[in-house]
From Swiss-Prot:
Disulfide bonds: none annotated. Pfam families: Rotamase (PF00639), Rotamase_3 (PF13616), SurA_N (PF09312). It comes from the Bacteria. This is Chaperone SurA. Its main location: periplasm. It is found in: Periplasm.
Length: 519
């Protein structure tokens, strides 16, 4: 449970922040009327594919159909978003090709979400909204007014937020759960940091937030932060040597253009196979040690604005650009495998703590707690789960049974064999609804049923203490950096596997090849 709770807490501090560009989630922010395309030396638009296809089908993804109308509408939104970012919009055919690739991957992910039965109800969306508003020190009503002022309806925003939470939970299950960082790896990482004092600052994270934190002051020093963008030329699984050579040649051509001074974001938007292509290739910011080793070796010593050489990975050929770098202490969006908004559109809603931290002891109030979790499903509704926990609570308060026995019998959490014991919990270790309910309890008190993204809980506080967690925080930060280092390639591997196992009939791509052969 603790690993899952921490995973969602990390999601709330990163992905939810990344969804907000100028106060909007990325997908919602794109749901605005498209502005006229900029004039200039842009190539004349080729005939729209809708003129060439009678059936109106752009692609078939397993059993789902993506229509040409969907592609056209998504292309208008993508065009408006690129213009807002100051990125040159590709010609219509290229833009639709890129948009269709994104729609295909989104459809594959949505199919996986449905297959795994991942659901997000209204209460969980409300919790996410309250969390975002709280961390940005505004009320949910003020946040709603800000969003609606931008032209996005509240219903659109909620739907976008729900979709993004579902997708993030999919990534947690499919990718995050398979990344295991051992204690030995953490020990080795910390020893390496000791030999490199400058980099060691990356593991000095701020203390977990206590209730009612004071506003942060900008830090003056901290770990090296690196903001990267990429162009990815994907090499499909099972490609022949000739195909790999052709793709390498394509990547080398793009590299030459980037080195010559062509706009990197425009090149990425028109040519990259990466999931962040239509954001100009932006992957966000991380401490240097948080990027994959391949990326650090290729771009770690480059200055802002410089472009790396060709980087080959298991997924293809990468071209990296250092968008910005800093000695630390400057607010930066935390990068994840999911696409991130470009930096020229800073979010008005900032989330997550600074990487840098003050030196010295880090004292927090720890809570020793235990819980019983009942998950909801198609056979266990919210009402049924809550009623069962209320019955268990009545028996516990009557003294007829022991908490640990009820946890072993009924809890669906991994802590059930230990009687639901969570051990000593630091502030911020659990999701906000769980933590708020836990903090309101006196020692030995049992909460009413509490709803979290994982299900319904009964929580009992056993005791509290003041504790110096400096070493624990440093180890936790080291583990997080090691995790982030693996997350990007792991996510790309998962996307490639998802694609290779699917039936995809890309009719726009077929039409383009047919036209090329007839020339």
């Amino acid at each position: 449970m603790m690993r899952s709770l921490h995973s969602l807490r990390r999601m709330s501090g990163t992905v939810l922040a990344l969804m907000l560009a100028a106060g909007l989630p990325l997908s919602a922010a794109q749901a605005q009327p498209a502005k006229p395309a900029p004039k200039g030396d842009q190539k004349p638009a080729t005939p729209a594919p809708s003129e060439q296809f009678v059936d109106g089908i752009a692609a078939i993804v397993n059993k789902d159909v993506i229509t040409l109308r969907e592609v056209r509408e998504a292309s208008k939104l993508a065009s408006a978003d690129l213009q807002k970012r100051g990125i040159q919009v590709p010609d219509e055919r290229t833009l639709q090709k890129q948009v269709l690739q994104r729609l295909i991957m989104e459809r594959l992910e949505r199919q996986e979400v449905d297959r795994m039965g991942i659901r997000v109800d209204e209460a969980q969306v409300d919790q996410a909204i309250n969390m975002i508003a709280s961390r940005n020190k505004i009320t949910p009503a003020a946040m709603r007014a800000e969003i609606e002022k931008s032209g996005v309806t509240w219903e659109q925003y909620r739907k976008s937020l729900r979709d993004d939470i579902r997708m993030d939970r999919l990534r947690q299950r499919a990718v995050d759960a398979n990344i295991i960082i051992s204690d030995a790896e953490v020990d080795a990482f910390l020893k390496d940091q000791e030999r490199n004092p400058a980099a060691a600052q990356a593991t000095r994270a701020p203390a977990p937030q206590q209730p009612q934190p004071q506003p942060r002051q900008p830090a003056q020093s901290g770990p090296a932060m690196l903001v990267l963008a990429q162009i990815l030329v994907r090499v499909p699984e099972g490609s022949s040597p000739d195909q790999v050579a052709a793709l390498r040649k394509k990547a080398e051509g793009l590299l030459a253009r980037a080195k010559k001074g062509d706009d990197f974001a425009s090149l990425a938007a028109a040519n990259s196979d990466g999931p962040e292509a239509l954001q100009g290739g932006m992957m966000g910011a991380r401490p240097l040690d948080g990027w994959p080793d391949l990326f650090v070796k290729a771009a770690g010593s480059l200055s802002a604005g410089q472009v790396s050489g060709l980087v080959q990975s298991g997924n293809g050929f990468h071209i990296l650009k250092v968008v910005d770098r800093a000695g630390g202490g400057q607010p930066a969006q935390a990068a994840r495998p999911a696409p991130a908004p470009a930096p020229q559109q800073p979010s008005s809603f900032q989330e997550g703590p600074s990487v840098a931290a003050p030196q010295g002891p880090v004292r927090v109030t720890q809570t020793h707690a235990r819980h019983i979790l009942i998950k909801t499903s198609t056979v266990m509704t919210d009402d049924q789960a809550r009623q069962r926990l209320e019955q268990i609570r009545e028996r516990l308060q009557g003294g007829a049974v022991k908490f640990e026995d009820m946890a072993r019998q009924y809890s669906q959490d991994s802590t059930a064999p230990q009687g639901g014991d969570l051990g000593w919990v630091n502030p911020g270790d659990t999701v906000p609804p769980f933590e708020a309910a836990m903090n309101a309890l006196q020692p030995n008190e049992i909460s009413p049923p509490v709803l979290s993204p994982f299900g319904w809980h009964l929580i009992q506080v056993l005791e509290r203490r003041e504790h110096d967690v400096s070493d624990e925080v440093q180890r936790m930060r080291a583990r997080q950096l090691l995790f982030e280092r693996r997350a990007v390639p792991a996510f790309e591997d998962w996307l490639e596997q998802l694609r290779s196992q699917a039936f995809i009939d890309n009719r726009l791509e077929k039409q383009e090849r047919l036209e090329q052969n007839n020339r």
